[in-house]
Amino acid sequence: MSAGTKASELRELGDEELLAKLREAKEELFNLRFQAATGQLENHGRLKAVRKDIARIYTLMRERELGIETVESA
């Protein structure tokens, strides 16, 4: 993931792609937390960006679940 994925970019993704992004972001967050705990993390702002990306993905998934927003088929 780039430094802070935009919601508009995420809205273009399908459900499976969104789940893949979520798994990727969670794995990155785990690695960043591990680096922070061992004192190896240089960019602490990245932790915040990844957490916000995860929140954006969960928000979009919930919107789709409630029918607020649907997947735009390309």
Swiss-Prot record:
Kindly list the GO CC terms recorded for this protein: cytosolic large ribosomal subunit
Keywords from the named record: Ribonucleoprotein, Ribosomal protein
Q: Does the keyword Ribosomal protein apply?
A: yes
Classify the source by domain of life.
Bacteria
Which GO terms label this protein's molecular function in UniProt?
structural constituent of ribosome
Q: Which InterPro entries match?
A: Ribosomal_protein_uL29, Ribosomal_uL29, Ribosomal_uL29_CS, Ribosomal_uL29_sf
The answer, when asked if rRNA processing is one of the entry's keywords, is no
The protein, known as? Large ribosomal subunit protein uL29
Q: Which organism is it from?
A: Streptomyces avermitilis (strain ATCC 31267 / DSM 46492 / JCM 5070 / NBRC 14893 / NCIMB 12804 / NRRL 8165 / MA-4680)
